[in-house]
From Swiss-Prot:
Protein name from the UniProt record: S-adenosylmethionine:tRNA ribosyltransferase-isomerase
Pathway entry: tRNA modification; tRNA-queuosine biosynthesis
Task of the protein: Transfers and isomerizes the ribose moiety from AdoMet to the 7-aminomethyl group of 7-deazaguanine (preQ1-tRNA) to give epoxyqueuosine (oQ-tRNA).
Keyword Manganese among UniProt keywords: no
Subcellular location: Cytoplasm
Organism field: Neisseria meningitidis serogroup A / serotype 4A (strain DSM 15465 / Z2491)
Amino acid sequence: MDISDFDFTLPEHLIAQHPPEVRGSSHLLVALPDMPLQDRVFGDLPDYVEAGDVLVFNNTKVMKARLFGQKDSGGRIEALIERVLDSHTALAHIRSSKSPKPGMGLVFEGGIRAVMVGREGELFCLRFEGGETVYELLEQNGHLPLPPYIERAADADDDSRYQTVYAKYQGAVAAPTAGLHFTEELLRRLKDKGAVTAEVTLHVGAGTFQPVRVDKIEEHKMHSEWFEVPSETAAAVEAAKARGNKVWAVGTTSMRALESAARATGRLKAGQGDTDIFITPGYRFNVADRLVTNFHLPKSTLLMLVSAFSGMGHIRAAYRYAVEREYRFFSYGDAMVLGRNEGVVR
């Protein structure tokens, strides 16, 4: 399949540079199968959820993963922590005029000292000195890594708004953005209606922003991310399916975690590990019936995922509609509700 099949024209002014003034006030495009497109607001989501449905949220927490400093040799350096390996060791992307060599010392803001001890592919392995953990050092001295299409520096407002209200476990370098729309009040309304909430963890990596650089998408190599599906979530999903209820994936990261855990048998099983699952049209979904998601970049792997879920023609029409009505796109943008359209590649 050609990458051009997933291209579309997006006016630059539709790329949201800031969150909405009030969390949860975004627009919601309801694009369910066999229904006309509907313009709603995100607070209307419970209208489409039935008692007994299960909504699966990604509880990852965005790290303040960006560090600025210099090498012992004096050159400037920027590190983006991709994955924390243990309390004092992490893998990082490095930007510098010259790549640091093994054994080279690095000094970051706040007096943080680290040594570059090796490499894993394109990533640099950093060993941090001192008694504080990597997470503690980042929380005190790091900067929130906003996506590259947000053309401004992170500010104090982003510290809360680029984080879901249910975030628990540090490890992500990008937010699971569909979850940014949910408020505590909306979660209460869903539970009051009889919906069941469940959680997975998928630590979103910087690879989520990597462009697809091949013409044939089958040749693309997907990045790897760590995920976990707890036994409680697997049980809640299986129970919902047994009673005929729907399973909602809140965001593409929740979807990738669920599908990764169900890939071996076709049924959701508890588990954890690394996943490089690449979902493209023709993929047969095993778990979710509904997907809550933001609007994605042209030619992106996430646009391929939603096209696989709801059908390429359906997504093209929905995106064309959203552009015409000036929905806001990407991380701080508006959201949509999609339904699974079995076996459709159009």
